[in-house]
């Protein structure tokens, strides 16, 4: 980009309050990988901290949810609000790389993520987990998290486990592959909208 052009700060804060959850998220895309995460679900906090560290995003998240019922509402709504914040922080997507992909190992597990920030919300998820729950987190919610995220982030996300046995390793590899795919996709590599339509 021309030297006299100052890149805008890509950040956004989004809040969402319902009868089930009360959530505020701040995202800084061009950050240092710092995460201050309090979703109320310890394992989800761990996964989101990993996402921040490996994507380079900074994120502050607080969620007060109806965990006395179960983790479903909190996990789903956290994903929806994060997706909205990222979408808003991407501004008009001028110069965006747009596409990103990564294959990430974690011991015996191997995860793949490919994504498109082109405004088309769709998630394809191929993974199975033997353990139904980890630290209060229902593993069936991994897929639902990414489906919800894709909706509000307006992104096409493909995730798959290629190898693996340990449930924790597989889920962490998925989040890390998503992090590295996002790190690639949000790079500014040009000066125009990356679409023949002229708008994303």
UniProtKB/Swiss-Prot annotation:
Pathway involvement of the protein, from the record: Amino-acid biosynthesis; L-histidine biosynthesis; L-histidine from 5-phospho-alpha-D-ribose 1-diphosphate: step 6/9
GO cellular component term, pick one: cytoplasm
Superkingdom of source: Bacteria
Keyword Cytoplasm set for record: yes
Molecular function via GO: imidazoleglycerol-phosphate dehydratase activity
Enzyme Commission numbers on file: 4.2.1.19
Gene giving rise to this polypeptide: hisB
Subcellular locations according to the entry: Cytoplasm
Protein name: Imidazoleglycerol-phosphate dehydratase
Enzyme class: lyase
InterPro entries: IGPD_sf, ImidazoleglycerolP_deHydtase, ImidazoleglycerP_deHydtase_CS, Ribosomal_Su5_D2-typ_SF
Organism of derivation: Chlorobium phaeobacteroides (strain DSM 266 / SMG 266 / 2430)
Transmembrane segments: none
HAMAP family: HisB
Entries under CDD domains matching the protein: IGPD
Keywords tagged on the record: Amino-acid biosynthesis, Cytoplasm, Histidine biosynthesis, Lyase
Family statement drawn from the similarity comment of this UniProt entry: Belongs to the imidazoleglycerol-phosphate dehydratase family.
Catalytically driven reaction(s): D-erythro-1-(imidazol-4-yl)glycerol 3-phosphate = 3-(imidazol-4-yl)-2-oxopropyl phosphate + H2O
